[in-house]
């Protein structure tokens, strides 16, 4: 994970040897292990590159990297497959080596088409004065652009800063493909032309042309007039990394496999009925296999202390977790945690991060330890809010519980995981957030991370994910509760399951209105817009803590496998809630030995954590959120 930035100026009066302080600070929070800046100047333009690294694999490689020909590379990504990267190697160096060997545009596109894993990048090709940049197919890594000064400068960055009342604000770079800017031509013409090399969505020529035309129109709509978007003249494309969605419909009328299910009490045995079918069981086993591989890649590609003596390994209380799971106890996070348990070394704890928003000031974890003992290596008070109130709260209500829905299911899920593997240390971290703390940190830290997204839903989920991934809370054990700060640099999240497996209520609405054909179109739309609705925002809020978000359900092989299945093998919305939606995932949970969690219906994070109940109750999720507006104009990082 990295914070990457490139500020380009076309006029001498806008040349600068440094980024503004607030932007630099935001980038450093993403990459705390190394910071470096590099200046490239020509007669026509200046490029200031800034790289900030979170070290997760191979040798620590400072960014930006450069070669003897003047090429410069900034990489914010992880290669999990497609290009070979040995355990001791750094994928930044591998990518730059291959890029420097590319002889033409086709070679560059071929290289990025091979990469499986999340990425965003900026590449300056000195010989052609070209600046290449883009995001992966799903947009799993944030990249923003900011055009200002009537075409005299622009900036690309993993994260921005915002101010209200300014028209030329940061926007997300669309995950439509890779872009190239001819900097020399732009400096002469005083207009920026974005050449798009789009993802190839299908094999049909007319369909491709229509998709490219639609992409160009959508991108241009949000840009200033001096920025033009055009398809590349050679009509070159990136190869789509996943197979197309199977839109097939059943030949016979679609009915539930077991009509008596809807009239029966829902139990784990209800799901076992489906697994008696040989084909269904085989498909579920295949799904478990591909998802397990995705989780394995994401929990093993990170540095571990392999030099501990056997005596130190036995001191499990001193062992730090390297991996955390955003954990509600729901079906998505339970399956991710169960699969992570299969691959993470047994002597290593796993942090389960469970967030809840408090409606009462005097709310603490059950069985709070009044002595305030601190656990070795994790002794950090989670927030100012608890520093102020912990002593009084402990005396007033030592056994009071915070019973928001996600806390209840989280505790139940913890017991399931402990029963499945009692040898593992499962760190259940209760993260409790007060209204005062929410409002203060939204104002000072979170709002600019969520932006340029701006809805009530973005506010709720963005804030909830920020507090959860921070990992500052209470570690609840049989002996009581202790202040705890998660040390995990990798945070697993279940995003992508609902979009692919008909987990949202809107899938049910579409199915009831338009049947399986409508459901297919809804799922296709969900996957197509996930980059602009969710992933850039989540990457920005999680990375703000110097941690990296990893998304197993959006592994290219997982998506391809699910895309290859007909929709009725993934979900059956004629069945009751808690079974029909995400049916294949529930069957996988049963096969993995999970119990009650396999039957939990979908509950959105903003409702399960109760953040949606903290402030206004009469808002719609799609409304623009006034709480995200920043009052001061002093925070803008790129001069106007």
From Swiss-Prot:
Provenance organism: Bos taurus (Bovine)
InterPro entries per record: Asn_synthase (IPR001962), Asn_synthetase_domain (IPR051857), GATase_2_dom (IPR017932), Ntn_hydrolases_N (IPR029055), Rossmann-like_a/b/a_fold (IPR014729)
Paired cysteines (S-S): none
Name assigned to this protein: Asparagine synthetase domain-containing protein 1
Phylogenetic placement of the source organism: Eukaryota, Metazoa, Chordata, Craniata, Vertebrata
The Glutamine amidotransferase type-2 domain, residue ranges: 2-184
Highest taxon of source: Eukaryota
One biological process term in Gene Ontology: asparagine biosynthetic process
Molecular-function annotations in GO: asparagine synthase (glutamine-hydrolyzing) activity
Pfam families: Asn_synthase (PF00733), GATase_7 (PF13537)
Keywords in alphabetical order: Amino-acid biosynthesis, Asparagine biosynthesis, Glutamine amidotransferase
Transmembrane segments annotated in the record for this chain: none
Keyword Methyltransferase: no
Active site annotation, chain numbering: 2 (for gatase activity)
